[in-house]
Swiss-Prot record:
Top-level taxon of the source organism: Bacteria
Residues binding substrate, per UniProt: N239, M268, Y297, H333, S353, R354, G355, D394, G395, L396, R397, E433, Y460
Gene field: thiC
Cofactor note: Binds 1 [4Fe-4S] cluster per subunit. The cluster is coordinated with 3 cysteines and an exchangeable S-adenosyl-L-methionine.
Entry keyword annotation includes Iron: yes
Family: Belongs to the ThiC family.
Entry-linked PANTHER family: PHOSPHOMETHYLPYRIMIDINE SYNTHASE, CHLOROPLASTIC, THIAMINE BIOSYNTHESIS PROTEIN THIC
Binding site for [4Fe-4S] cluster: C581, C584, C589
Pathway: Cofactor biosynthesis; thiamine diphosphate biosynthesis
Enzyme class: lyase
Organism: Salmonella typhimurium (strain LT2 / SGSC1412 / ATCC 700720)
Cofactor: [4Fe-4S] cluster
Protein name: Phosphomethylpyrimidine synthase
């Protein structure tokens, strides 16, 4: 029975069963490895794909094999990808970063929650059954201190998070010895700096320059450090979250775990339904990846969905609430200025960003400047106290191909650049959000404008979608644009699922969106010439040419689908060793023919060589032993 045919009660029960029976799980023929750093508690997780040996000769009774090296790959699944770790969603994940946060001695536990709304929720006994039981006591920077990774980087301090990231970004490629696997085409990097080996000092330098961010709230110690910047691997974000009409806490936690399994580097909780506060707590306590939010969504819920009733005070309380829960980055639509709103009147699709439309409506109804812009310095002060990164939202992004690259879009982008410099005054980390709907020939301008206007702060885009004609397939239309803008320098790609413009995605939609965007991100890394990016491709090509079917499945981004497609026509075990697939059959397989040509050419070379030696032997008189001068 597919998810779409289940009742709401059945969906919740299924999600609850998933949570109750959750165990650490490895991908087929993969194992979890940990690469250690300079101190014992820096243990960086990676997935190592084990490969079978290559048959190189011998006989049927005595075959000769050559070993193939295991291929290490980046792993976002956290403890969920380690079969040796006991998982208990009720207790949450281990607090990996807590010792590092405590050792810095620049933060302190709060006596009480700073948010009035949080205090109200905690006092409500009716929420006991929904509430995560092991609530942390939130921390905040001590008076006069800043606790951001940007602050440490500017002070010349290499944090454990930075060392963790350096090891992670190198992806264990130093373990690979095979020249075949290490071979890589030169890339075209459009000015990106891509060192052969990423060091902790390089990570620090990039963060200090504002070219990269490490989203790592001190109240989310469960997260594994990662970095977003154009001089690192291209990252992918997945969106989850309930709505007023569908989804539950259990389903959102299930989607979180599912997202990290399929490669989400960060996850945004875009919940707009009931129990937003409680849902977010469960997500944070069980998330090994950074969590982002759009605080204006929850602030709007607090005023019963009436945009005109929003106030700075309600929004500020929401920021404090979420920062003390552990949210790692906020999307803030502070660039939607009153004077920019009329620019959207001539658009075909107007303002399509939820956050952008909320703020535009507030500005027009009060005929005042955006209160997020007016109070931006106060927002930065809050972020600096918890190390919440800012994702400056593109509230005026184009929602159709016709509206791409217009005056409203780039006016807002210029303002985001000004806000970036203000945030940096407070040592707050910043990335910039981008479009949207942009045809292929207009995509590169978005990247060059962002780098110039926003001082090389990391770019984070939704696609962009390259055509508007394919509802139901917008993971494809946007994946094309995502690969291109990732190549041009975009640091993180926000996935689009097949449900875009149509409905709230389910588990399968999340997987489809993530696989599509992992392809786009990897294609961008290859095109940029990111060191080591081609290793997995080379391993796959070698396995494909050698008809190592199991290795082909296991090297795939989605081993299960690869195997299922193969087995639709060749399900027998003999099909896993056959030197053909059902596409061409045994007589027309190009790779089988290529192998035969190669073997024939090698035999011909040997035969010609033997003939030459025979002729030389006869020319020298046919003597078995020659005098030294003749030899």
């Amino acid at each position: 029975m597919s998810t779409t045919t289940l009742t709401r009660r059945e969906q919740r029960a299924k999600a609850q069963h998933f949570i109750d029976t959750l165990e650490g799980t490895a991908f087929p023929n993969s194992k979890r490895i940990y690469v250690t750093g300079s101190q014992h508690d820096i243990r960086v997780p990676m997935r190592e794909i084990q490969l079978s040996p290559t048959l190189i000769g011998g006989s049927k009774d005595n075959p000769q094999f050559e070993e193939n090296e295991a291929v290490p790959v980046y792993d976002t699944s956290g403890p969920y990808g380690d079969p040796e770790v006991a998982i208990n969603v009720q207790q949450g994940l281990a607090k990996l970063r807590q010792p590092w946060i405590d050792a810095r001695n620049d933060s302190e536990e709060l006596d009480d929650r700073s948010s009035a709304y949080t205090r109200e929720r905690l006092a409500d006994d009716g929420l006991d059954d929904l509430r995560f039981t092991g609530l942390l006591t939130p921390k905040r920077a001590k008076a006069g201190k800043r606790v951001t990774q940007l602050h440490y980087a500017r002070k010349g301090i290499v944090t454990p998070e930075m060392e963790f990231i350096a090891i992670r970004e190198n992806m264990g490629r130093e373990r690979i010895r095979s020249e075949v696997l290490r071979h890589q085409h030169p890339g075209m990097n459009f000015g990106a700096r891509l060192p052969e080996n990423i060091t902790p000092e390089f990570v620090r330098d990039e963060v200090a320059a504002g070219r990269a961010i490490i989203p790592a709230n001190i109240n989310h110690p469960e997260s594994e450090p990662m970095i977003i910047g154009r001089n690192f691997l291209v990252k992918v974000n997945a969106n989850i979250g309930n709505s007023a009409v569908t989804s539950s806490i259990e389903e959102e936690v299930e989607k979180l775990v599912w997202s990290t399994r399929w490669g989400a580097d960060t996850v945004m909780d875009l919940s707009t339904g009931r129990y937003i506060h409680e849902t977010r707590e469960w997500i944070l306590r069980n998330s090994p990846v950074p969590i982002g939010t759009v605080p204006i969504y929850q602030a709007l819920e607090k005023v019963n969905g009436i945009a005109e009733d929003l106030t700075w005070e309600a929004f500020r309380d929401t920021l404090l609430e979420q920062a003390e829960q552990g949210v790692d980055y906020f999307t803030i639509h502070a660039g939607v200025l009153l004077r920019y709103v009329p620019m959207t009147a001539k658009r075909l699709t107007g303002i399509v960003s939820r956050g952008g439309s909320i703020m535009a409506k507030w500005c027009l109804s009060h005929h005042k400047e955006n209160f997020l812009f007016e109070h931006f310095r106060e927002i930065c002060e809050i972020c600096a106290a918890y190390d919440v990164s800012l994702s400056l939202g593109d509230g005026l992004r184009p929602g159709s191909i016709q509206d791409a690259n217009d005056e409203a879009q780039f006016s807002e982008l210029h303002t985001l650049g000004e806000l970036t410099k203000i945030a940096w005054e407070y040592d707050v980390q910043v990335m910039i959000e981008g479009p949207g709907h942009v045809p292929m020939h207009m995509i590169q301008r978005n990247m060059t404008e962002e780098l110039e206007s926003c001082h090389e702060a990391p770019f984070y885009t939704l696609g962009p979608l390259t055509t508007d004609i394919a509802p139901g397939y917008d993971h494809f239309t946007s994946g094309i644009g995502a690969a291109m803008i990732g190549w041009f320098g975009c640091a993180m790609l926000c996935y689009v699922t097949p449900k875009e413009h149509l409905g709230l995605p389910n588990k399968e939609d999340v997987k489809q969106g993530l696989i599509t965007y992992k392809i786009a991100a990897h294609a961008a890394d290859l095109a940029k010439g990111h060191p080591g990016a081609q290793i997995r491709d080379n391993a796959m090509s070698k396995a494909r040419f050698e008809f190592r079917w199991e290795d082909q499945f296991n090297l795939a981004l989605d081993p299960f689908t690869a195997r299922a497609y193969h087995d639709e026509t060749l399900p027998q075990e003999s099909g896993k060793v056959a030197h053909f697939c059902s596409m061409c059959g045994p007589k027309f397989c190009s790779m089988k023919i290529s192998q035969e040509v190669r073997d024939y050419a090698a035999a011909q070379t040997i035969e010609i060589g033997m003939a030459d030696m025979s002729e030389d032997f006869r020319a020298k008189g046919g003597e078995i032993y020659l005098k030294r001068e003749e030899a």
